C-alpha cells in the first residue's frame, strides 16, 4: 500500500490534504479432503477441492478538508477509488471479475456544547468487495461439523451509515453519560439462501440488488459514589433490522427487534470484603413475511445474573462465592433455568498463593441453550463437567 502526498496546504485552523496511492491485495486459497481410509491420499473431486487465487488492485485519490478550532473539529474526506478484482479457479481456469469506480465520502464533526457536554455527528459511504472466503466452488470445512459451498459471483456491499452521539463527562462527580444513535443502509448484489443436507450447507445466490436497514439506539450511564465506594453502570440497547432473504426459494421479508439492558454494581466500601453483581435482561423478536403475509413470529426473553462476593478473613486468607443464574424462554415452548454455584479459598504464604475451588456445586450436568436469529431457531444441549474440586498454585519471584 503506497501513497504520495501531492498537496498539503494549511491556513490557520483550516487544512486541505490530497493523497494519491495504489493498494494491492493477493490471496491464495487451497483446500482438499483426505481419504478417510488413507490420510496421505487426497480426494480430488471438483466439489471437494479449491485452488483459487484472488487479486484486487485499487488506485485511489484521497481529498481531505479539516477544520480545528479549540475543541470544534470538522473533517470531510472524499476518496475516489477504482477497484479491479479478479478471482481465478486454477482447477478449471474460470475467472470471476468485478470492476467499478466509487466515490466514498466520510464526514466527522465534533461540537462541544458546554465544558462537559459534547456532540458528534458522522456519515460514511463505503463500497466493499468480499474476499475469497465468500465465494468458492468447492466445499470448505467451516467448523468441526459443517461444510459450506458458495459458487456465486464476487459479492459486493455498499454501505451508508449516519450516526450521532452525545457525551457528558463530569469526573469530579464521577458521572459519565453517553447516548448514540446509528442508521445504516446496506445494499448487496446477491440475494442468498442456505440449503442444509445433514452436515452439508450450500449457499444459493441470485444476482439481485437488495437492501438491509438497521436502526440502533444505545445508552450508557456510569456513576461512582465516592462516600459509598460504589460504582453503578447501566447499558441499554434498542435495535431494529429489516432485510430480504430467500427461504425455500421464496423472497421473505425479515423484521427483527432487539432490546437489552445491563446493570452492574460494584461495592468496595468494606474492609472485610467486596461484592459485584451483573444483571442482563434481553428481549428479542423476529417476524417473517411472504407476499405481505406474516408466516412466523418468534419472541424470546432471557435473564442472566452473576453475583460475586469476596471475604477477607485475614491479611493472607480470603474466600469467595460466585453464582450464576440463567432463565430463557420463548414462544416456541422452550424454557430453561439454571443456577450455578462456585466456592473458593485463597491463602498467601510468602511468594506462593494457594487457591482451592469447588465449581458447579449444584451439579448441573447438561446446559440447554437456544440460538434464535432472524430466520432460524436452533437448540443445543451441552454436557458440562459436574461438581469438581481444583487446587492451583501461583508463584511470584
Question: Over which residues does each language-model region extend?
Answer:
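Exposed, low-structure sequence patches enriched in small/polar residues
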Residues: 1-397
Amino acid at each position: 500500500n503506497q501513497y504520495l502526498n501531492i498537496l498539503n496546504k494549511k491556513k490557520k485552523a483550516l487544512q486541505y490534504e490530497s493523497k494519491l496511492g495504489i493498494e494491492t491485495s493477493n490471496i491464495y486459497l487451497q483446500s482438499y479432503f483426505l481419504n478417510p481410509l488413507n490420510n496421505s491420499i487426497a480426494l480430488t473431486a471438483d466439489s471437494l477441492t479449491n485452488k483459487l487465487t484472488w487479486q484486487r488492485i485499487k488506485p485511489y485519490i484521497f481529498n481531505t478538508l479539516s477544520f480545528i478550532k479549540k475543541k470544534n473539529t470538522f473533517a470531510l474526506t472524499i476518496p475516489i477509488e477504482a477497484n479491479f478484482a479478479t478471482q481465478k479457479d486454477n482447477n478449471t481456469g474460470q475467472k470471476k471479475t468485478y470492476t467499478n469506480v466509487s466515490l466514498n465520502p466520510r464526514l466527522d464533526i465534533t461540537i462541544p456544547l458546554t465544558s462537559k457536554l459534547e456532540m458528534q455527528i458522522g456519515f460514511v459511504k463505503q463500497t466493499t468487495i468480499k474476499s475469497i472466503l465468500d465465494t468458492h466452488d468447492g466445499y470448505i470445512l467451516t467448523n468441526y461439523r459443517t461444510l459450506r459451498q458458495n459458487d456465486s459471483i464476487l459479492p459486493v456491499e455498499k454501505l451508508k451509515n449516519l450516526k450521532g452521539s452525545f457525551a457528558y463527562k463530569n469526573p469530579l462527580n464521577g458521572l459519565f453519560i453517553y447516548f448514540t444513535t446509528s442508521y445504516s443502509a446496506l445494499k448487496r448484489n446477491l440475494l442468498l439462501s442456505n440449503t442444509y443436507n445433514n452436515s452439508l450447507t450450500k449457499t444459493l445466490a441470485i444476482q439481485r440488488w437488495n437492501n438491509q436497514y438497521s436502526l440502533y439506539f444505545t445508552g450508557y450511564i456510569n456513576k461512582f459514589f465516592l462516600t459509598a465506594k460504589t460504582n453503578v453502570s447501566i447499558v441499554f440497547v434498542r435495535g431494529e433490522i429489516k432485510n430480504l432473504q430467500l427461504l425455500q426459494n421464496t423472497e421473505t421479508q425479515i423484521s427483527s427487534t432487539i432490546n437489552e439492558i445491563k446493570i452492574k454494581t460494584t461495592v468496595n466500601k468494606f474492609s472485610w470484603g467486596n461484592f459485584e453483581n451483573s444483571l442482563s435482561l434481553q428481549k428479542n423478536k423476529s417476524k417473517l413475511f411472504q407476499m405481505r403475509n406474516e408466516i412466523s413470529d418468534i419472541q424470546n426473553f432471557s435473564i442472566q445474573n452473576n453475583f460475586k462476593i469476596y471475604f477477607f478473613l485475614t491479611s493472607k486468607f480470603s474466600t469467595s462465592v460466585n453464582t450464576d443464574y440463567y432463565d430463557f424462554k420463548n414462544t416456541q415452548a422452550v424454557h430453561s433455568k439454571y443456577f450455578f454455584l462456585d466456592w473458593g479459598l485463597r491463602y498467601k504464604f510468602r511468594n506462593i498463593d494457594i487457591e482451592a475451588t469447588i465449581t458447579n456445586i449444584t451439579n448441573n450436568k447438561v446446559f440447554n441453550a437456544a440460538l434464535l436469529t432472524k430466520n432460524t431457531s436452533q437448540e443445543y444441549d451441552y454436557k458440562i463437567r459436574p461438581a469438581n474440586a481444583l487446587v492451583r498454585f501461583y508463584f511470584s519471584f
